[in-house]
């Protein structure tokens, strides 16, 4: 799997080169996420900022740091274009097997069976970065929450995995 075969020395160099480029607020976000991962706390972190302020850059450094340390860190986005900007990124619908018509059911569910390779990957991951989550239907987040709780056998929010949601509420219509 791609998620377990990253070039770790290259990622370590990337982190060393770019950690010092983070602004004060970006470094605070980085430290907050890393602290939760290192302590195994899990958590739900939202990074809200206008476009062009470095959310994707900060997320990329966070992903690289965890992947360089043999941790599974997944990157998804609400759109294909946004997912292509994250290393190893894919759409949330593809990774979580979300139904296309989320309004069809009151409680839609992800089409992932326990014991499958993708379920195992979700069980082992320490971090999920979800870019452009402000464009995501709330039922998608609820479905992923239930999936992670089931796969990880943990009833904490998102099964205890650290969820870094990024986006810009200024781009969302009322």
Task: Describe each PLM feature range.
Residues 1-174:
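Conserved ATP-binding/catalytic motifs of P-loop helicase motor domains
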């Amino acid at each position: 799997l791609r998620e377990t075969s990253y070039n770790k020395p290259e990622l370590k160099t990337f982190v060393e080169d770019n950690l010092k480029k983070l602004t004060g607020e970006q470094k605070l976000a980085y430290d907050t996420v890393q602290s939760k991962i290192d302590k195994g706390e899990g958590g739900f972190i939202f990074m809200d900022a206008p476009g062009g302020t470095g959310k994707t850059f900060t997320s990329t450094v966070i992903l690289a740091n965890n992947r360089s340390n043999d941790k599974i860190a997944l990157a998804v986005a609400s759109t294909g274009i946004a997912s292509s900007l994250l290393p190893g990124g894919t759409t949330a619908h593809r990774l979580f097997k979300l139904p296309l018509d989320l309004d069809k059911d009151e409680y839609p569910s992800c089409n992932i069976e326990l014991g499958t390779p993708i379920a195992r990957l979700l069980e082992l991951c320490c971090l999920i970065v979800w870019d452009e989550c402000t464009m995501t239907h709330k039922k998608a987040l609820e479905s992923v929450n239930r999936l992670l709780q089931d796969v990880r056998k943990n009833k904490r929010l998102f099964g205890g995995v650290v969820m870094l949601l990024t986006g810009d509420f200024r781009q969302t219509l009322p």
